[in-house]
Curated annotation (Swiss-Prot):
Function: Plays a role in pre-mRNA splicing as a core component of the spliceosomal U1, U2, U4 and U5 small nuclear ribonucleoproteins (snRNPs), the building blocks of the spliceosome. Component of both the pre-catalytic spliceosome B complex and activated spliceosome C complexes. As a component of the minor spliceosome, involved in the splicing of U12-type introns in pre-mRNAs.
Protein name stated in the entry: Small nuclear ribonucleoprotein Sm D2
Gene Ontology biological-process entries: 7-methylguanosine cap hypermethylation; mRNA splicing, via spliceosome; RNA splicing; spliceosomal complex assembly; spliceosomal snRNP assembly; U2-type prespliceosome assembly
Taxon lineage: Eukaryota, Metazoa, Chordata, Craniata, Vertebrata
Origin: domain of life: Eukaryota
SUPFAM superfamilies in alphabetical order: Sm-like ribonucleoproteins
Domain Sm intervals: 29-115
Keywords per UniProt: Acetylation, Cytoplasm, Isopeptide bond, mRNA processing, mRNA splicing, Nucleus, Phosphoprotein, Ribonucleoprotein, Spliceosome, Ubl conjugation
Residues annotated with Phosphoserine modification: S9
Modified residues (Phosphothreonine): T12
Length: 118
């Protein structure tokens, strides 16, 4: 019987480990697996409406991640005084050398479009 069809409750710890590895290599988490193996950048949209562009060093099934060389990007609308027109949004960013990202704040993870196209 294939590991994908067998109920998890009937699996040995070794079979569970093998199945998780298989899912990480073929399932949706394969984007993160490839990023770790090839040291490529990913773009992560977060729930705080910020984007993170960086390299994934490690991750788990909850999408918790250790990231390096991260550029955090967001937009801010400056406060306008009385009688002034609406201000235009301003793009902001900052560099973070190492960070831990909790998985529940992740919306979507994309391969770096500049490299993925090659």
């Amino acid at each position: 019987m294939s590991l994908l069809n067998k109920p998890k409750s009937e699996m040995t710890p070794e079979e569970l480990q093998k199945r998780e590895e298989e899912e990480f290599n073929t399932g949706p988490l394969s984007v993160l697996t490839q990023s770790v193996k090839n040291n490529t950048q990913v773009l992560i949209n977060c729930r705080n409406n910020k984007k993170l562009l960086g390299r994934v060093k490690a991750f788990d099934r909850h999408c918790n991640m250790v990231l390096e060389n991260v550029k955090e990007m967001w937009t801010e609308v400056p406060k306008s005084g009385k009688g002034k027109k609406k201000s235009k949004p301003v793009n902001k960013d900052r560099y973070i050398s190492k960070m831990f990202l909790r998985g529940d704040s992740v919306i979507v993870v994309l391969r770096n479009p500049l490299i993925a196209g090659k």
